[in-house]
Amino acid sequence: MAAAAAAAVAGVGRGGGGAEPRQERSRARGWAGVERSEGRRMEPGEELEEEGSPGGREDGFTAEHLAAEAMAADMDPWLVFDARTTPATELDAWLAKYPPSQVTRYGDPGSPNSEPVGWIAVYGQGYSPNSGDVQGLQAAWEALQTSGRPITPGTLRQLAITHHVLSGKWLMHLAPGFKLDHAWAGIARAVVEGQLQVAKVSPRAKEGGRQVICVYTDDFTDRLGVLEADSAIRAAGIKCLLTYKPDVYTYLGIYRANRWHLCPTLYESRFQLGGSARGSRVLDRANNVELT
């Protein structure tokens, strides 16, 4: 079950190749080093998106700008803790060495990294990249755009199912500081302990702003699995707003400020203090229906 979600946290490195445009090789240097991920490319633009209403320009950024900004991050090395090859007892030392509020995007003086870092990620023991037919998905998307047929959430869902591109992720945005580092540590431990599968966090940008933590699931059409991941995130101590986005939107370059006025997030989760054993209320954004 972890394969698709694991593929969603695979980054691209310099010179990476393969028939699939988002596939690349690994160049790990141990848990404390820099690693280029296996499988498909990581999400472009996640640290900049998901906060506003769909459509148009927002904060001066178009969907194309968001994609281009983070594509550069995808090309840089990542800091990775790989539970498949590294003892869980080493996680705390790794977290202490690379707190996301201190790791900088371009390796600023005084930061733990001297070189650029695209993402910080934790792979669970079930990590096994499998992104589906991304090339076929993108070709079908190009054909759809030139066909004149309507582009709706339903058509994108069907494209994803047809090409087996089913992974998705819960996103949470936090300002740099203790709360971010504490939240990331909780998520990382949940991944290593098996409650969650794969996760990543963006490094601190030079211009500041919130950083994003992404927690992946195998299948965005599996509502129960998506809700179980939400519960595990809440159990890890996360209380901020969460939004859930299928990876098909990212592969096709569809962000919040897109020309089709599509909302790329399916679900919204808000922490609920008391009254609910699961600790959150989850809203189906497309249908405006509470699921929990």
From Swiss-Prot:
Name of the protein in question: UPF0696 protein C11orf68
Keyword Ligase annotated: no
Record keywords: Methylation
Compositionally biased residues, Basic and acidic residues: 35-44
Family note: Belongs to the UPF0696 family.
Modified residues (Omega-N-methylarginine): 29
Underlying gene: C11orf68
UniProt GO MF annotations: RNA binding
Region (Disordered): 1-60
Native organism: Homo sapiens
Start-end of Low complexity biased regions: 1-11
Keyword Chaperone: no
Extent of the signal sequence: none
